[in-house]
Amino acid sequence: RSEAGDRLPSERDLADRLGVTRNTIREALSVLESMRVIERRPNSGVYVKDIRMESSVDLLVLQADLGLPGTADDNFQAMEVRSLLEVQAIRLACRRRSDSDLEKMRQILQLAESQIAKGQPINEEDEAFHMAIAAATKNAVLRRVLTVFYLMYRSRRMVYFSDKERSQRSQSHHRKMYEAIEARD
């Protein structure tokens, strides 16, 4: 296991240890470098960076996809950022939404109601509703950033929404958000 600041073994060494070609190692290192997990230092080698300070949001998604737990502090901070962004998304959607944006949200709310009535979780509808709000902002950057949060927490939301009460509570919040956006309030 490597820690921040550690020098990685040579490409040849890594290839031998992992039973792959050097080309495969080079490709993997390029991906890790683009995600800011490692840095190449000329005439020195490849070093592990402090990912808590320098990694890209892509790494957060990868970490979630691989089922690697973040720290409680990481999770709290991610939810804090998501909450800030979603509040701003609702404000922008109130000003910029179109009738077709409202129709999309209305359809998602109806689908979620149907899922709840059947005792099914609404994790997909939850994501779709929030992404419909993001689309209504007409801000492509905000939409992409919010997408990262939904990718990060996809598996957690499946568990969260397996509880019918949570689904109902979430649906109630969604209705209030929809009404505020509809009223431009």
Where are the regions that the model predicts?
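Short loop-to-helix capping motifs
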Residues: 10-11, 138-140, 184-185
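Conserved amphipathic alpha-helical segments that form helical-bundle/coiled-coil interaction surfaces
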Residues: 78-159, 169-180
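Short linear motifs at protein or domain termini
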Residues: 1-84, 91
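Structural signature of alpha-solenoid helical repeat scaffolds
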Residues: 162-165
